[in-house]
Amino acid sequence: SGQMGNSEVGHMNIGAGRVVFQDLLRINKAIDSGTFKSEPILQEALEIAKQNGRRLHIMGLVSRGGVHSQQEHLHEIVDAVNRAGVPDAVIHAFTDGRDTSPKFGLGYLKDLESHISQTNSQIQIASVHGRYYAMDRDERWERVAHSYNALCSNGGDEFESVESGVISSYDDHTSDEFIVPFRIKGVAGQIRPNDVVICFNFRTDRCRQI
């Protein structure tokens, strides 16, 4: 309800002669029914991180655009991490500005921080990346390198908080899509060998490269 469709969805339903649930709706229905939290692949990832003392990295587009991801899905994963008792978990947030208004990103990130706080979670946001860098799909590797270095090599600028980093970008007339990847000071978020990574984008084409 209230989610914009597109030609692909229309053609698929017309061709099938029936309603074909898209990934967004299928995940929403799994959350509503309670089956999402027991999803085997999700539980396996959480268990591996917990039992082996590895850092859990959650990455994806923090947005309510509904094209590549949906923010409520991330909130559900945060809740699942809390229930599993994973001690070391961070979020690498990609900002939208393409399927949403150009500067809605800070509001979405504040909503995420509020959810984390309300659930007494120890999860922290470790880095923020504009989708221009983190979600390239056309082999523009010089773009992807900015995100890769922030994720794996402590590259990019550091800011005291998510808000200060995003506002700095806005002050430079840089909208959400083009935010140069930055890290949050004091948050250990580097991806190391044998760490566990969950990408919560339900559309796969723009996260294959990273």
Predicted features along the sequence, with ranges:
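Active-site nucleophile/metal-coordination loop of metallo-enzymes that catalyze phosphate/sulfate
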Residues: S1-Y132, E142, H146
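Long, well-ordered, tryptophan-enriched scaffold segments
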Residues: T100-R192, V196-I198, F202-C207
